[in-house]
Amino acid sequence: MTDQLQGSPVLAEVLGDALPKLERFHAKIAEEGEPRGLIGPRDVDIIWERHILNSAAIVPYVRNATNGIRFKTVADVGSGGGFPGLVAAACLPDHDFTLIEPMERRIEWLHECVGLMQLQNVEIIRGRSDAVIQQVRKREIHPFAVVTCRAVAPMTKLSGWTLPLLKPSGQLIALKGRSAQAEIDKAGKEIAKFGGRRPRVVEAAVGPDLEPTHVVIVDKR
C-alpha cells in the first residue's frame, strides 16, 4: 500500500536534510510496523502525515527551548516506535537524545532503526521514566534541557513522569490531541507539584495543507 504523501514535495520542505534518513525509517515501519505492533492497520498509508510529520512538528519548539544552551540534551519518554524521538533526532543532529522505553521488543526496534538511520546522537535506555528520575536525583546522570513525548499518558500522570527529568528552565514539549487544553486545566495541581509553570497549548504546523497538531509546553522552575 502506497503512502498518501510518498514522493510529495512537502516531505523535503518540512524535513530538509533529515529526509533520506526518514525515508529509510518510513520504509522499515511501512513493512514491519503493523506486524510488530507499532502502528495500526489503518495507519499504513498515512505514516508520513500521522506519525513522521506529526512528530517533526515539535522540532521548532525544541530548537527554541535549547537556543543558547551549550549542552542540548533531550529525553524522549515512552519512545515506542520512535515517535517523536527518532524523528526529532534525525532533524536535530546537533542535539543529544536519550530515548526511554520500558518494553524489550520496542528497545530492539529502536536499536535497529538507529543503526539503519545512522544516527550518531541517540542513546537508548530500557526502563521506566521513574528509574531515570532516580538517577537524576542521585546525580548519576544530568537533568535534561528538554523532555519530549507523544501519546504516553494524560497530563495528570505525565507531569510526574517528565518534569523531574528537567533542569531548571528546561521545557516539557508533549504532542497531544484536541483535548490538550482540558488536560492541562485538570492537571494544574500535578504540574505545580513537580516544578512546572506556565503550561500552555500551541497549535503546531505539520505541513502545508495538512491539519495542524497540538503541543503542550510546560516550563520547569
UniProtKB/Swiss-Prot annotation:
The keyword Transferase applies. S-adenosyl-L-methionine binds at G78, F83, R150. InterPro entries: rRNA_ssu_MeTfrase_G, SAM-dependent_MTases_sf. GO terms for cellular component: cytosol. It is an enzyme of class 2 (transferase). It is found in: Cytoplasm. It comes from the Bacteria. Its EC number is 2.1.1.-. GO terms for molecular function: rRNA (guanine-N7-)-methyltransferase activity. Pfam families: GidB. Keywords: Cytoplasm, Methyltransferase, rRNA processing, S-adenosyl-L-methionine, Transferase. Its main location: cytoplasm. Specifically methylates the N7 position of a guanine in 16S rRNA. HAMAP family: 16SrRNA_methyltr_G. Belongs to the methyltransferase superfamily. RNA methyltransferase RsmG family. This is Ribosomal RNA small subunit methyltransferase G. The gene is rsmG.
